[in-house]
Amino acid sequence: MALLASAIYSCDDTTGSLGLDMLPGSDNVNVSSTSFDVTTKSILSGPVFAKTDIGYVGKYTDPDFGYFESGFLTQLNCTDSLQFPFGVMAGDTAHLAELVLFYDSYFGDSLNACKMSVYELNKVLDKSHYTNINPDNYYNKSTGLIGSKSYSAVDLSISDSIRNSSNYSKYVRFVLPKSFGDDMIKLNKEHPEYFYNADAFIKNVFKGLYVKSDYGDGTILYINHVNLNIIYNSHYTDSLGNFLKKKDG
């Protein structure tokens, strides 16, 4: 019988209790699982210090957490001692003024129809501010509007080949009134000191932007870069700085 028992153990490949048989019975742990009903609720936190390089804009309704809406205020920097090349410009006016908001990612519906508006600030933002900042204190809704734009997170008017390229960045583009660019060029010519650095530019030329969601529940854009472009016409010049004329034909 002892030989038979030994043969049975040699053929048993069950390892579930391997090692446990060598432990004292007092060291065995009995494991069981169960479930409990719990109740949760969301509590609105107080204001926190706002320090981020991402601007969120859009609206979203969550079945569990409710309605969420976001816009952002931002300032624009200019390069030190920025100056338009008046010597080669074809006139002292702008050809085009545009504002471009770039984003790498978004949350929600990619094709949801949305609209946003951009307002110029009439007050310089504080150096330090918290999330309970009231945008209404920094712009005039009646006179500060500089552009509105309908959009979706994925722009199907742009071909797949371009959107899928490695150097493509998603964006929302506003074409601004030409007078916006004309005024900035004029100010640059008359007061170059206003463009000496970013602080002078913000204080004297352009205090900043408020980007506000108008409609389109279901999409939040994560804006990570804002460009203000003033485009102008200029003359072609040779190596001596002489203007070149277009040849006939």
Question: Where are the language model's segments positioned?
Answer:
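Secreted, disulfide-rich extracellular signaling modules
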Residues: M1-G249
